[in-house]
């Protein structure tokens, strides 16, 4: 097994630290392991510069994986890399999509005995990458509102209530947008209809297991695009229930298509890309970059 460089978030909590130590104990039975903690993009870039030929392992959740993949992409080094992933924390949606165990020790065993598989990547019109999923509309608005409440409530030590409050406010008063969504140049929805949510998925789930694009596979060379036109109060309730079960793609007011290029334009909207908020926007586009890097996944 190649020597490993494990990159972790310097601000990880004590529970994550304990999980990581258990995983490192397993990995050190197989190879040499160095651990580096990074707190900002500058530190991460320095660690990557010194990585050499060691296999890089990301210890963290979707945000940590996004940060490392994005930095390697900017450096022009992603294509030649095989990465590993040790899921930590509570989200880990991309890990779920590729079948990585969420238990730290089991993930370390899978990493030690796994096989590299090519992974696709979403790249936007200015060259920024998305590893897992980008969505527009209700989910992004909930995240935006939740971030505001998290900031306010964090001063009282209850910042974790921010997102549920943001989601509740959005469910009561969601953004209904007039958008034109095109997939490979073909319109899926146009300005004559209101849209509740648009999702472009490389991975299946968001928010710690909600399968927003349940048929997505990050290695199949296609993007899954979901457009919800559930704009009435009752239809929104039904959509939310079906979303929880992963059956929403078959609903009459949901379009679920696949392609390699996606564009969204129209009224001002916000995007949530791998959990990072961006906006307001009038036009965004994304394309698939096939087999952009390799990731070690469990043997099947």
Which sequence ranges carry the predicted segments?
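Catalytic core of DAGKc-family lipid kinases
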Residues: 5-8, 17, 21, 35-38, ...
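Glycine-rich phosphate/pyrophosphate-binding beta-alpha loops
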Residues: 135, 139, 199-214, 277
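Glycine-rich beta-strand-to-loop/alpha-helix junction loops that act as flexible
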Residues: 10, 59-61, 86-88, 202
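ATP/NTP phosphate-donor binding region
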Residues: 1-59, 66, 71, 105
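ATP/nucleoside-binding phosphotransfer catalytic cores, i.e., glycine-rich phosphate-binding loops
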Residues: 183-190, 211, 217-300
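Short beta-strand/turn micro-motifs composed of small residues
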Residues: 7-8, 60, 229, 266
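Short N-terminal binding/cap micro-motifs at the start of the first secondary-structure element
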Residues: 13-17, 207, 295
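Short glycine-/acidic-enriched loop or helix-start segments at secondary-structure transitions
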Residues: 16-17, 67-69, 95-96, 141, ...
């Amino acid at each position: 097994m190649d020597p490993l460089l494990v990159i972790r978030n310097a601000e990880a909590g004590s529970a994550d630290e304990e999980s990581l130590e258990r995983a490192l104990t397993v990995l050190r039975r197989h190879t040499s392991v160095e651990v580096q903690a990074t707190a900002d993009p500058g530190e991460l870039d320095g660690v990557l510069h010194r990585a050499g030929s060691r296999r890089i392992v990301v210890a963290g959740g979707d945000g940590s994986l996004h940060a490392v993949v994005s930095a390697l992409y900017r450096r022009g080094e992603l294509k030649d890399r095989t990465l590993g992933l040790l899921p930590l924390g509570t989200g880990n949606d991309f890990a779920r999509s590729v079948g990585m165990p969420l238990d730290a020790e089991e993930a370390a065993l899978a990493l030690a005995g796994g096989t590299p598989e090519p992974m696709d990547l979403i790249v936007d019109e200015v060259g920024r990458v998305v590893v897992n999923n980008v969505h527009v509309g209700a989910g992004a608005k909930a995240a935006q509102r939740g971030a505001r409440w998290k900031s306010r409530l964090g001063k009282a030590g209850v910042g974790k209530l921010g997102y549920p409050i943001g989601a509740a406010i959005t469910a009561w008063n969601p953004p209904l947008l007039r958008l034109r969504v095109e997939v490979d140049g073909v319109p899926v929805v146009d300005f004559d209809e209101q849209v509740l949510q648009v999702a472009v998925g490389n991975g299946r789930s968001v928010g710690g297991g909600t399968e927003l694009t349940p048929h997505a596979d990050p290695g199949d060379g296609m993007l899954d695009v979901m457009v919800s036109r559930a704009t009435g109060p009752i239809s929104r309730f039904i959509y939310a229930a079906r979303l929880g079960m992963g059956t929403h793609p078959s609903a009459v007011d949901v379009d679920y298509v696949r392609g390699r290029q996606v564009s969204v334009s129209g009224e001002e909207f916000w995007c949530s890309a791998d959990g990072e908020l961006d906006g307001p926007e009038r036009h965004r586009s994304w394309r698939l970059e096939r087999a952009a890097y390799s990731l070690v996944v469990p043997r099947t």
